[in-house]
Amino acid sequence: METPALLALAVALAMDALAVAVATGCRLRTVSARQTLRLAWHFGLFQAAMPIAGWFMGQGIRSFVDAWAHWIAFGLLAFIGLKMLKEAFEHDDAECGMADPTRGTSLIMLSVATSIDALAVGVTLSMLGLSIWMPAAVIGLVCLGLTAAGVQLGRVLAASSALSRYAEILGGAVLLGIGFKILHESGVFG
């Protein structure tokens, strides 16, 4: 695969991770370097691992990936998005009781949801007879960088007084929006 095409593919695959990272930065408002690195590392790792897994799965599972990947991604994003919205309306103080999306189950679910498209890319690269190692490394590194930038952008956006109060609502709505976008792109809505 040529370098410009590989970079374009990596950026395209990282767009969901970037949007989730911005939403996470908005939600947390004060983001430590550790939280940024943890989210970026996991998103990048999953984004690199999924095409490798897809490549090894090859043609045998393509019909399953094509049929169910969008539903899996939607379910994970909708679950976390609705959880964020619920927490936004339950707590008067935005910081009170807020779970950190850069830890635990939420982190793993977000990592899977934002990288599941890369699984299908791996299957496709396998069917084309292309090597997976360089594409997987580039995809993971691009995702890591865009995720780190996205978290910081979200933090800056949340610092503005107009957005600060509604950052968690915005974050949940963004996750739901990405989930519905995935369903729309897969043809669920016709």
UniProtKB/Swiss-Prot annotation:
Q: List the transmembrane segments.
A: 5-25, 41-61, 64-84, 105-125, 127-147, 169-189
The gene name on file is mntP
Q: Which HAMAP family match?
A: MntP_pump (MF_01521)
This one is known as: Putative manganese efflux pump MntP
Superkingdom of origin organism: Bacteria
Localization of this protein = Cell inner membrane
Q: Does the keyword Lipid metabolism apply?
A: no
GO molecular function annotations of the record: manganese ion transmembrane transporter activity
Alphabetic keyword roster? Cell inner membrane, Cell membrane, Ion transport, Manganese, Membrane, Transmembrane, Transmembrane helix, Transport
The species this protein belongs to is Oleidesulfovibrio alaskensis (strain ATCC BAA-1058 / DSM 17464 / G20)
Concerning its family, UniProt says: Belongs to the MntP (TC 9.B.29) family.
What membrane topology does the UniProt entry give?
Multi-pass membrane protein
